[in-house]
């Protein structure tokens, strides 16, 4: 196979429908936000964590406007990379900020993988050794890698099926949890006992990570049907769906667990919240939904981030070596993305991964808005 072919990108135009694109976006968003971040945010801001989710939603809604306007004008598989290129040209700021987004997305992918392991191990009484969580996360990434190799139709079909089951299951959990608890309640702390405003802002920043999955939609621009219309619509639908689901489930968790219990079970707080509300069957149901949600998130994240890196390489913003691998550059970046995700999943814990990811994302997000304003 020629070197030229090795360094060529191949996109399946018109292979993603609007519902399929929405499912890819919500796959990342719902997987990270509900199952991985609820306990982390509660630890930072106390009983006010559902309000931190809402504050993050407001900020992201304003932020999404810039992405929608740019994606309508420049739909591309490069997504963020292409937008930065339009704003800053073929210069260092474009490559630097695009790579921050790339690493942020890979970190989110690893975050989801370890969350998958944490929930799965609750079926077996937890992971006292600490070994099985990363092993299960690594296995999930490898399965998602194989599915991504098999083409967009399969990715869309799997993501859509998982998305429908996941959203239905989470809504059932939220509604039943609130119904059994008898009310939607938060124990608002006294001002003297409330967390510092800085803690609430920190939790809100972490909550933004729960919504940033909408940016993965922008990386599908070359493959979405009628991209100038459907990318913006998919972003709006994804954010609206996540606001509804996050709010509902946040209040359900707060109504069934004390703050101390949420923090103690922060890596699997939804499963813990299901026990008092629904018993052991509810725990198993919630774990199954969590496994589907995080698996769908991994699938969508790998799909989006590998395409963005391929576009950056095509624009000659980052160097590329194919190391003798056959196929298009898109397949090569898929391999590199998976290898990096495997390393992060195996050696970093949830809190470190989340903190690093949000810093990278926020720096890149500021650059996007500054570029639009220029």
Task: Say what each PLM segment does.
Residues 1-48, 61, 65, 188-191:
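Membrane-interface "cap" regions at the ends of multi-pass membrane proteins
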Residues 3-12, 50, 127-135, 160-283:
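Helix-loop-helix junctions that connect adjacent transmembrane segments
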Residues 22-23, 49-54, 95, 134-139, ...:
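Hydrophobic alpha-helical transmembrane segments
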Residues 40-43, 52, 62-141, 145-149, ...:
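Hydrophobic transmembrane alpha-helices that form the core helical bundles
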Residues 44-47, 74-77, 86-93, 222-230, ...:
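Juxtamembrane helix-boundary/capping and inter-helix hinge elements in multi-pass membrane proteins
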Residues 54, 58-62, 99, 103-106, ...:
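Generic alpha-helical transmembrane segments of integral inner-membrane proteins
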Residues 82-90, 122-126, 236-299, 317-350:
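TM-loop-TM module centered on a large, flexible mid-protein loop between adjacent transmembrane helices
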Residues 194, 324-331, 365-374:
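C-terminal membrane-solvent junction of multi-pass transporters and transport-like membrane proteins
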